[in-house]
Regions:
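Basic polycationic patches enriched in arginine
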Residues: 21-23, 29-30, 34, 39, ...
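Residues marking helix boundaries in flexible regions
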Residues: 10-13, 33, 54
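Residues lining hydrophobic/aromatic ligand-binding pockets adjacent to catalytic sites
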Residues: 53-238
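Charged/polar low-complexity intrinsically disordered segments
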Residues: 11, 26-28, 42
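Extreme N-terminal basic, low-complexity initiation segments
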Residues: 1-12
């Protein structure tokens, strides 16, 4: 029997709390490489085994985003179950919909409960923010759309950072999906929440429809500042 970890360690680690972040993850990578045999019985290099373990760890604690749109509640629940979501974080500023009352705050939790999916409304991550007079317009000048610009300004606040930290904390013990009303992520403020999660080292996927899940990527314009703040400066005129 070979000394050190084997591929079965993946099954053990993906059930552990998600604590390998930043430097801690790099330390884990260093230690596991040292004690993994140079070649496994399957012919994989130690580096390949480490990459597999790290990938599975990230996947096990990934965040998802979803928009409810006009979907029937059954279809919506199926989308969450397909990726094994256990917590739905509602980031609508007003958790109600006249056109789709099945997504109202007084109805949605009951619809999710039989499937062991918890519900939480995170008001401080909600969209539809007003102009932030404390932030100069050029700081987030990339956003020509006023709603996105205002939200990018709001995301620089302590209130947003605190709410984001709470979301990440919940994501360490539950597989979390962030929900708003807009069906597609690129027309919703959850794209900015996604940027902040990715900048913090999280893994994020967008749920688009049945069998349609895509990996998220940080907006290429976003620049990370102190205290984990992102700015979106206007692109230089060509």
């Amino acid at each position: 029997m070979a000394d050190g970890p084997t591929l079965s360690i993946v099954e053990i680690l993906v059930t552990a709390p998600w604590c390998y972040r930043g430097r801690a993850l790099e330390e884990f990578r260093r230690v596991i490489t040292r004690f993994t045999p140079h070649r496994s019985a399957q012919g994989q290099s130690a580096a390949a085994v480490v990459a597999l373990i790290v990938q599975d760890l990230r996947m096990a604690h990934a965040f998802y985003t979803i928009g409810h749109g006009r979907r029937p509640i059954g279809e919506f629940v199926d989308l969450l179950r397909d990726v094994e979501v256990t917590l739905l974080a509602d980031v609508r500023i007003v958790p109600r919909s006249r056109a789709n009352p099945q997504y109202n705050e007084d109805a949605l939790p009951q619809a999710l409960q039989p499937f062991d999916i918890a519900y939480t409304h995170m008001t401080d991550l909600g969209g539809l923010r007003g102009r932030q007079k404390s932030v100069a317009p050029e700081i987030n000048g990339f956003w020509e759309n006023e709603s996105f610009h205002n939200y990018a300004d709001y995301a620089m606040s302590e209130r947003f950072r605190s709410a984001l930290a709470h979301l990440r904390e919940r994501g360490r013990t539950q597989r979390c999906a962030i929900m708003c009303a807009e069906t597609v992520w690129w027309r919703c403020h959850r794209r900015i929440i996604t940027d902040y999660l990715l900048a913090a080292g999280e893994t994020v996927f967008h749920i688009l429809g049945p069998g349609q899940v895509e990996a998220a990527a940080v907006n290429e314009v976003a620049q990370l500042q102190g205290a984990g703040t992102l700015v979106y400066p206007a692109e230089p005129a060509s």
